[in-house]
């Protein structure tokens, strides 16, 4: 049986990490695309030469033309300018919006049946623009945000309680930014909700609040430490979890930036919510109940995303007609 074709649009740090993980998990053949001549070709060759050592079979190629995306089953988009110290995700908007228009046109022409995962920041606005530019069904275009944010939350909680990350579940909703909403009542250790663990004396509410705040600023913390770029190992691993659920019809429940059209009271926007990802793309949006402070925080996050989307509409009004 022929292997699935996975196109990586953008061959920087995340793109290279994605390519290697795809091989290690034997998810399919890889084509790496980038506008920088030689970069996708060189990285593809380098990773391909690791296959005899790592023990996987896959075909790798690099390209500078969108034609290489032809018939890709999955497209993962990392193209754009990375976030740098002192730069907010909002600062990236106008530059990366133009990139999404170009990428969307390429996907529309050569891979109209693909499942598309966007990683480019500011994420919630960029995945909205990418879906508009590509014209693909909304259920086939998602943004990688919640899996990463939840993974950071899980790691910090596991470290706090000195338990395995495998026994920690966490939910982070809303936009991928400072207004994200880590939900403590839906986050557990071996099935025990965080509020109960506070009552049991395992930790304090003040400490949980500190972890929530660190989760919200998880990306910025790494940017400030690296000084030359942003995170790439965890973002790549998060996108691979989404791609694998689609390719293997695993139907995992994952928090992603998904298109909402009435769910959670939101219309025509991409916001981080739990979804089921299977062979049809986003097969179900899990509309959990939000009340009190959680609802207020979610609405605030949605408003922040709306602000970015409105800015996109002003910069590229023609997107609305697609």
Curated annotation (Swiss-Prot):
<feature type="binding site">
    <location>
        <begin position="119"/>
        <end position="121"/>
    </location>
    <ligand>
        <name>NAD(+)</name>
    </ligand>
</feature>
<dbReference type="InterPro" id="IPR001236">
    <property type="entry name" value="Lactate/malate_DH_N"/>
</dbReference>
<dbReference type="GO" id="GO:0006089">
    <property type="term" value="P:lactate metabolic process"/>
</dbReference>
<dbReference type="GO" id="GO:0006099">
    <property type="term" value="P:tricarboxylic acid cycle"/>
</dbReference>
<feature type="binding site">
    <location>
        <begin position="10"/>
        <end position="15"/>
    </location>
    <ligand>
        <name>NAD(+)</name>
    </ligand>
</feature>
<dbReference type="InterPro" id="IPR036291">
    <property type="entry name" value="NAD(P)-bd_dom_sf"/>
</dbReference>
<dbReference type="Pfam" id="PF02866">
    <property type="entry name" value="Ldh_1_C"/>
</dbReference>
<keyword id="KW-0816">Tricarboxylic acid cycle</keyword>
<feature type="binding site">
    <location>
        <position position="34"/>
    </location>
    <ligand>
        <name>NAD(+)</name>
    </ligand>
</feature>
<feature type="binding site">
    <location>
        <position position="96"/>
    </location>
    <ligand>
        <name>NAD(+)</name>
    </ligand>
</feature>
<keyword id="KW-0520">NAD</keyword>
<feature type="binding site">
    <location>
        <position position="83"/>
    </location>
    <ligand>
        <name>substrate</name>
    </ligand>
</feature>
<feature type="binding site">
    <location>
        <position position="121"/>
    </location>
    <ligand>
        <name>substrate</name>
    </ligand>
</feature>
<dbReference type="Pfam" id="PF00056">
    <property type="entry name" value="Ldh_1_N"/>
</dbReference>
<comment type="function">
    <text>Catalyzes the reversible oxidation of malate to oxaloacetate.</text>
</comment>
<feature type="binding site">
    <location>
        <position position="152"/>
    </location>
    <ligand>
        <name>substrate</name>
    </ligand>
</feature>
<comment type="similarity">
    <text>Belongs to the LDH/MDH superfamily. MDH type 3 family.</text>
</comment>
<dbReference type="InterPro" id="IPR001557">
    <property type="entry name" value="L-lactate/malate_DH"/>
</dbReference>
<dbReference type="InterPro" id="IPR015955">
    <property type="entry name" value="Lactate_DH/Glyco_Ohase_4_C"/>
</dbReference>
<dbReference type="GO" id="GO:0004459">
    <property type="term" value="F:L-lactate dehydrogenase activity"/>
</dbReference>
<feature type="binding site">
    <location>
        <position position="89"/>
    </location>
    <ligand>
        <name>substrate</name>
    </ligand>
</feature>
<dbReference type="GO" id="GO:0030060">
    <property type="term" value="F:L-malate dehydrogenase (NAD+) activity"/>
</dbReference>
<dbReference type="InterPro" id="IPR022383">
    <property type="entry name" value="Lactate/malate_DH_C"/>
</dbReference>
<feature type="active site" description="Proton acceptor">
    <location>
        <position position="176"/>
    </location>
</feature>
<protein>
    <recommendedName>
        <fullName>Malate dehydrogenase</fullName>
        <ecNumber>1.1.1.37</ecNumber>
    </recommendedName>
</protein>
<dbReference type="InterPro" id="IPR011275">
    <property type="entry name" value="Malate_DH_type3"/>
</dbReference>
<keyword id="KW-0560">Oxidoreductase</keyword>
């Amino acid at each position: 049986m022929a292997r699935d074709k996975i196109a990586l649009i953008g061959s920087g740090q995340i793109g290279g990490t994605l390519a290697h993980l795809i091989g290690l998990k034997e998810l399919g053949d890889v084509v790496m695309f980038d506008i920088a001549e030689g970069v996708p070709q060189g990285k593809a060759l380098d990773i391909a030469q690791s296959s005899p050592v790592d023990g996987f079979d896959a075909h790798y190629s690099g390209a500078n033309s969108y034609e290489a995306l032809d018939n890709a089953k999955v497209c993962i988009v990392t193209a754009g300018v990375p976030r740098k110290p002192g730069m907010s995700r909002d600062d990236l908007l106008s530059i990366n919006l133009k990139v999404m228009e170009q990428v969307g046109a390429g996907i529309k022409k050569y891979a109209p049946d693909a499942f598309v995962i966007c990683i480019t920041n500011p994420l919630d606005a960029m995945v909205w623009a990418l879906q508009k530019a590509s014209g693909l069904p909304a259920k086939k275009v998602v943004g990688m945000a919640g899996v990463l944010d939840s993974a950071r939350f899980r790691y910090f909680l596991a470290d706090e309680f000195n338990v395995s990350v495998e026994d920690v579940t966490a939910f982070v909703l809303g936009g991928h930014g400072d207004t994200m909403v880590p939900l403590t009542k839906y986050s557990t250790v071996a099935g025990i909700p965080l509020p109960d663990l506070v009552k049991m004396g395992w930790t304090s509410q003040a400490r949980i609040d500190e972890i929530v705040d660190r989760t919200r600023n998880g990306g910025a913390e790494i940017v400030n430490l690296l000084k030359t770029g942003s995170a790439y190992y965890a973002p790549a691993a998060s996108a691979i979890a989404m791609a694998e659920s689609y390719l293997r019809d695993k139907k995992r429940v994952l928090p992603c930036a998904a298109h909402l059209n009435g769910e959670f009271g939101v219309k025509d926007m991409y916001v981080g919510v739990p979804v089921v990802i299977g062979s049809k793309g986003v097969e179900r949006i899990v509309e959990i109940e939000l009340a009190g402070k959680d609802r207020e925080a979610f609405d605030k996050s949605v408003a922040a995303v709306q602000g970015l989307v409105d800015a996109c509409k002003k910069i590229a009004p023609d997107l609305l007609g697609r």
